[in-house]
Amino acid sequence: MLWKKRKVLYFAGISVFILILLLLKLNSKPKANVWPTSSKIVIYNRIPKTGSTTFTNAIAYDLYKENGFSVLHVNMTKNRQVMSLPDQYTFVNNITTWTERLPAFYHGHVAFIDFQRFGIANPIYINIIREPLERLLSHYYFLRYGDNYRIGLKRSRAGNNETFDECYSRGGKDCDMKQMWIQIPYFCGHYHFCTEVGNPEALRVAKQNVLEKYLLVGTTSRMRDMIALLEVTVPDFFKGALGHFDSLDANRAHLRYTKKKIPPNDQTLSMIRRDEVYKMEREFYDFINNLFDAVFKKATNGISKADDLVKLPLQYHFEKIKPS
């Protein structure tokens, strides 16, 4: 009889325990998709000939010791800017689990990768773009005359002194408007249509990614303003960046300056400005420029001075705190 009572109590206890577990499971809220290391990784998917070498070397590589972070270059095979889906997965997995390197600043000529597609929160994305024709001209003459960064290196078009005007008039490859289709794809990402020259969907997605996935995108002409914004927005990486940038001599503050550039004539400019690819890239540039200008003015209370930005007090405070 005693054994039967104990058996009943035993099964009753098990039933209550199972019931409690079920209730806890039903009442528990699903955990948010939080990646604790997301704020410890900055990705700068840099675009060629936009001042990216200056920004990377004069800021990231100069400040990593003082601010205590790692800097890593993402070297893309055969100068590709996109990865296969498996490579995207391993890339996301590698940099989010490589805890020994955190906090980390990654940079490389690679199109935007959306970490959220793999169930992980995106890191801090930043970038810099340049007026599209200026960027193309810089790249065109860079291939022929090189720059002030790696002086002894012979470039692929060395000895070819054809001007951009001459190239454009004969329909040359180096000055083809397909060569201008580069900044939109970098922000569009890895969808198949991103690299399709002149695809309107690529422009739409690029704009959307800038708004939703990037912390900040600046322009080459306002690099100093961008550095000031980053210093107060991501101080763990960019503390002291503006003062350091201002202390650099002219050569270090403008690395990879193309040695010789010949401005195109009015006829060439007129034809390029009517080209649909240029119009789209220019629309994207203006979109970024206007967005950055609005962010900067808001951050500086309309003063629009980088020097004042790092000194401005907070525009909010906490009060009525309970428990006191």
UniProtKB/Swiss-Prot annotation:
Record's keyword annotation contains Metal-binding? no
Any one GO MF annotation of this record: heparan sulfate 2-sulfotransferase activity
Q: What is this protein called?
A: Heparan sulfate 2-O-sulfotransferase hst-2
- Gene it is expressed from: hst-2
**Biological role:** Catalyzes the transfer of sulfate to the C2-position of selected hexuronic acid residues within the maturing heparan sulfate (HS). Involved in cell adhesion and guidance by specifically modifying proteoglycans in the extracellular matrix and on the cell surface that are essential for axon migrations.
What happens without the gene? Worms are viable but display axonal and cellular guidance defects in specific neuron classes.
Q: Which GO terms describe its cellular component?
A: Golgi apparatus; Golgi membrane
- Entries under Gene3D superfamilies matching the protein: P-loop containing nucleotide triphosphate hydrolases
Looking at its record, which EC class is this enzyme? transferase
Q: Enumerate the Cytoplasmic topological stretches.
A: 1-6
Q: Which UniProt keywords apply?
A: Developmental protein, Disulfide bond, Glycoprotein, Golgi apparatus, Membrane, Signal-anchor, Transferase, Transmembrane, Transmembrane helix
